[in-house]
Amino acid sequence: VVHVVFVAPRFLENTNRYVRAFAELDDVTLTVVSADPEAAIPAPLRPRVAGHYQVADPLDGGQLTTAVRAISRGIGPVDRLAGALEQLQLPMAEVRDALGIDGLRVATARNFRDKDRMKAVLRQAGVPVAASALARSPAELRAFVDRVGYPVIVKPPAGLGSRA
């Protein structure tokens, strides 16, 4: 039996689909970490969830580490740590590194969470990528546009759109 801890910041409809998918797997013990209380777990899923640990901020690697450590003591060793949100990948990697859980590590998570770093890694591997620059000011952005021309796409280095 594989013990999976799923990080569900909130028990929203889309997140519940992932919780349900893990809950329906044979030979999986499922525990969830969430900012929501245990009562927020949808009633049909509760019988398949072995445990719940509530944290104030599921995006905080320290809080997740504390939660997973407590889950390991209370329910048993954790084999996998999963979560659907892109923003969870770095804090979950911090937990894996801290507790020796198999899966994506911090260095790798940073490679795909930070767009500038990701492009540098791809370039080093010989993968062609579009010209890019980490512009920290309007002047740096103008200099990049002067060098490469239009069109350009401007994105934050990490995060979703304008919510970096």
Question: How does the language model describe each region?
Answer:
Residues 1-108, 113, 117, 139:
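ATP-binding N-terminal substructure of ATP-dependent carboxylate-amine bond-forming enzymes
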Residues 44, 144-145:
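Short glycine-biased active-site loop of nucleotidyltransferases that positions the nucleotide triphosphate
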Residues 51-53, 110, 130-134, 164:
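Structural signal for short hydrophobic segments within the conserved structured cores
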Residues 102, 125, 158-161:
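A short, flexible beta-alpha/helix-coil linker loop
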Residues 111-130, 137, 144:
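Glycine-/Pro-rich loop/turn segments that contact NAD(P) or position catalytic residues
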Residues 131-132, 151-164:
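Glycine-rich phosphate-binding loop of ATP-grasp-fold ATP-dependent ligases
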Residues 146-150:
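Nucleotide-sugar donor-binding and catalytic loop/hinge architecture
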